[in-house]
């Protein structure tokens, strides 16, 4: 089927689905028969990357599990943003959670890709936030060509990881050797910044991440946290502001302190069902800074959204290199290359 989300939705009306499995047979066929790069890129669904990049033959995704009640969903493969928002609204008493992919999911992906590519790079959700990278490492012990797989902790989430992945796509298409690709990714991991504004404290209080008493005091004082990802990949408080509007302006101010007015960098914005705030950030970034590539806007991964709630926005960018710019930076605008062309479905081929 071309719509696994609908199949799982209907099946879920008749009981709890104990296991879900989605394979992109078309992409597997293309990777096996039309691979035109030496390196494949693997991300998990906590990495928010534009669809046109996800469609490329050499880009593959391992889905994170999203859990509401007793039901588990495969993020992005069988759970669209619209359906996720619907579930997030309906489960008001019990917040949704996320769970790392099974080791077997990585094992199948790595085994398949190492059979068709010289090298495989997995850019994973921050290891300080999830066991996803650990699951990927466990999978390496189960495949023959483990030396062909590089596992890199993004120390980030959502569009923070997405910005790094976009550069990796460019380098792979440019035919760079795996050593240069790894070095470039590792450099960007250390320079990627993610700033998060949360207009409502409801999700933080409901999930227990913010105590009810402290949450009530914060609400009375109209205090809102700005969050960021630190150098270890942990979510930490960057600042406290009075009101959501002040939070938006503070993020622009923080970026200005890092880049300077008119500073050049890559940017991306994620949001939780709040396209308006995302467009506001894009306009302000274009006004005050010099985007090196197009600013992509995406729905935030459930890995962020389940914890922060509706209205959240996250802005990602690269800090300048200490040496005036990374030697790994690409010159393209991020649009090089083409997506995979249509190919016959070979149901019996690819990942089992």
Spell out what each predicted region is.
Residues 1-35, 197:
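Extended amphipathic alpha-helical scaffolds
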Residues 16, 116-119, 263, 291:
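Short loop/turn motifs at secondary-structure junctions
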Residues 90-93, 97-138, 182, 189:
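Glycine-rich phosphate- or other oxyanion-binding loops that anchor nucleotides, phosphorylated ligands
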Residues 89-91, 117-122, 142-153, 297:
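Glycine/charged-rich beta-loop-alpha catalytic/anionic-binding loops adjacent to active sites
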Residues 40-105:
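N-terminal glycine-rich anion-binding loop in soluble enzyme alpha/beta folds
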Residues 1, 28, 34-40, 46-60, ...:
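Mixed-charge interfacial surface used for oligomerization/domain docking
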Residues 5, 104-107, 111, 248-256:
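Amphipathic, non-transmembrane alpha-helical secondary structure
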């Amino acid at each position: 089927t071309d719509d696994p989300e609908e199949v799982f939705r209907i099946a879920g009306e008749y009981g709890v689905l104990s296991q879900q499995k989605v394979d992109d047979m078309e992409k597997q066929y293309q990777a096996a028969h039309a691979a035109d790069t030496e390196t494949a890129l693997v991300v998990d669904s906590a990495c928010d990357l534009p669809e046109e990049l996800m469609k490329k033959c050499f880009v593959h995704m391992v889905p994170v599990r999203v859990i509401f009640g007793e039901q588990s969903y495969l993020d992005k493969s069988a759970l669209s943003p619209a359906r996720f928002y619907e579930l997030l609204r309906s489960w008001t008493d019990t917040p949704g959670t996320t769970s790392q992919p099974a080791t077997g999911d990585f094992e199948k992906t790595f085994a398949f890709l190492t059979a068709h590519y010289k090298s495989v790079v997995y850019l994973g959700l921050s290891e300080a936030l999830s066991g996803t990278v650990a699951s990927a490492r466990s999978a390496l012990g189960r495949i023959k060509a483990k030396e062909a797989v590089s596992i890199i902790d993004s120390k980030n989430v959502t569009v923070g990881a997405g910005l790094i992945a976009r550069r990796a796509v460019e380098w792979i298409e440019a035919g760079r050797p795996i050593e240069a690709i790894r070095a470039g990714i590792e450099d960007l991991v250390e320079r990627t910044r993610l700033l998060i504004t949360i207009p409502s404290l409801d999700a933080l209080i409901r999930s227990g991440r913010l105590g009810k008493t402290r949450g009530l005091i914060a609400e009375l004082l109209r205090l809102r946290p700005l969050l960021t990802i630190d150098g270890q990949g942990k979510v930490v408080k960057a600042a406290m502001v009075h009101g959501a509007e002040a939070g938006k302006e503070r993020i622009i101010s923080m970026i200005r302190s890092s880049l300077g007015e008119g500073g050049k960098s890559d940017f991306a914005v994620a949001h939780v069902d709040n396209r308006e705030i995302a467009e506001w950030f894009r306009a302000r970034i274009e006004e005050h800074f010099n985007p090196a590539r197009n600013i992509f806007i995406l729905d935030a991964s459930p890995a962020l959204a389940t914890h922060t709630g509706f209205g959240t926005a996250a802005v990602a960018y690269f800090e300048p290199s200490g040496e005036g710019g990374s030697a790994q930076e690409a010159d393209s605008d991020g649009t090089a290359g083409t997506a995979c062309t249509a190919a016959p479905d070979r149901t019996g081929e690819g990942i089992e």
